[in-house]
């Protein structure tokens, strides 16, 4: 159970010492980290955010390779963090174990599902932490808690030893308060030990996406554009694109997910092609979640909290219809975005539609925010491209952020880029 003196971040406090045997100083020596309760640690039951899951599963017989690699690199783990049940929320509220307290905005949600991991970093309880990001579970809490969050290219970091949510989207991500630590951790997890700064060929600002966001456009975009100019001397091409229009024209399989609601919803709250992209992503997530956990749910009949329960019921009812179309959307989107970005282009989008919502917010208002959030989160989610959420301080006393997205496999480039820009943002 979470305790009061740690912002409610931890489900269990336990020190796991480094295992490095190298004669030279390991790369993460002296750093501490926290582990989301989705990763196996030998000898303990992985809780997956739900007491019934904890009760009906056995202790892990081995530790997830991603955790082992961090320990081998010299880092010390200080505990296991709270997460949203079954990783099925981006809100950060857990009806069973309590909601980790957002250190930057006490009356706002911390974001999920990697809520405790983000809070532990933001509250300076650890130097970095690991989480997972399926539909936004690293990017969202990073934004809400005012820290850096990195979602790698899908498959770039091993997912062995973590409880799956939806394998087509599951990634291992990490949080840090500064880009130097973010990069150091990335070098270990990505097994890339020499990441030199590379100038981006173009900075592509998805102008229409910023209309989904309540934070003023210039407040998010100008610091980034200015930092690129200062870092690289103004050689990077900066251009704007209507991303929704581009995706709509170049991902034809999205037609299977377009609805009349997408077209008639007010423009400031909806980009039809991105709504369709979000629908495709969430359908395939539900399908894979059902395959992974449907039998356990039917057998155990676990108790789920509000919001989670309804989402899981919907997943259990999901049919196989349109699943092939989901996979076509993914393939077409990868091609379309690869063409748009070129070799070293970077896409600029809001991480989320605005500052973190209030705790126990109105359900209808929260659903509108969630819908716009998934329009943004599905871009990297479906394509499998890497994305970093960059904190930009406070707006009206609440944390705000912007994101950079780079093509599949460009993780090292993106980590080095954000590290180069940090001094000027």
Swiss-Prot record:
GO terms for cellular component: cytoplasm; cytosol; extracellular region; nucleoplasm. The keyword Hydrolase applies. Disruption phenotype: No visible phenotype under normal growth conditioins. InterPro entries: Amidase_CS, Amidase_dom, AS_sf. Optimum pH is 7.0. Optimum pH is 7.5. The active site is at residues 36, 113, 137. Optimum temperature is 35-37 degrees Celsius. Optimum temperature is 37 degrees Celsius. Keywords: Acetylation, Auxin biosynthesis, Cytoplasm, Hydrolase, Nucleus. It is found in: Cytoplasm; Nucleus, Nucleoplasm. One of its GO terms (molecular function) is hydrolase activity, acting on carbon-nitrogen (but not peptide) bonds. Changing residue 36 to R: Reduces catalytic activity 10-fold. GO terms for biological process: auxin biosynthetic process; indoleacetic acid biosynthetic process. Pfam families: Amidase (PF01425). Inhibited by phenylmethylsulfonyl fluoride (PMSF). SUPFAM superfamilies: Amidase signature (AS) enzymes. Belongs to the amidase family. Amidase involved in auxin biosynthesis. Converts indole-3-acetamide to indole-3-acetate. Converts phenyl-2-acetamide (PAM) to phenyl-2-acetate. Substrate preference is PAM > IAM. Can also use L-asparagine and 1-naphtalene-acetamide as substrates, but not indole-3-acetonitrile or indole-3-acetyl-L-aspartic acid. This is Amidase 1. The gene is AMI1.
